[in-house]
């Protein structure tokens, strides 16, 4: 999972991820937007579920984050569309709408994101 942190002309932090993990970047850009308190909340929840059978979920406007003891899933809320609504033979391109990664890798990304924001 490759990624980079950037700043646009206004100083807003943007995150780009490699193919297969793009949704994590979209989630950070759309749902977190540099909110360190939200990062604190997610990291605390990760510490609670780590090594357990428990799960935790954070619903956002566009994306939902799920954590369990080993894995993280970021999923676009638009994927809640029922299969009945699809025309026969059609399926969704969801590579940029769904991502799974390990909890430790995800926490490293959040730490890098936090460090980049603080390092203005």
Swiss-Prot record:
It holds the Pfam family UPF0231. HAMAP family: UPF0231. InterPro entries: UPF0231. Belongs to the UPF0231 family. Signal peptide: none annotated. This is UPF0231 protein YE0706.
């Amino acid at each position: 999972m490759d990624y980079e942190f950037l700043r646009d002309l206004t100083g807003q932090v943007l995150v780009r991820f490699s193919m297969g993990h793009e949704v994590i970047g979209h989630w950070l850009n759309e749902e977190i937007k540099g909110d360190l308190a939200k990062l604190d909340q997610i990291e605390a929840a990760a510490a609670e579920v780590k090594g357990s059978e428990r799960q935790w979920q954070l619903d956002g406007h566009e994306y939902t984050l799920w954590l369990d003891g080993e894995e993280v899933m970021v999923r676009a809320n638009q994927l809640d569309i029922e299969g009945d609504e699809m025309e026969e033979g059609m399926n969704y391109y969801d590579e940029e709408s769904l991502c799974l990664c390990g909890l430790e890798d995800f926490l490293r990304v959040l730490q890098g994101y936090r460090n980049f924001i603080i390092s203005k």
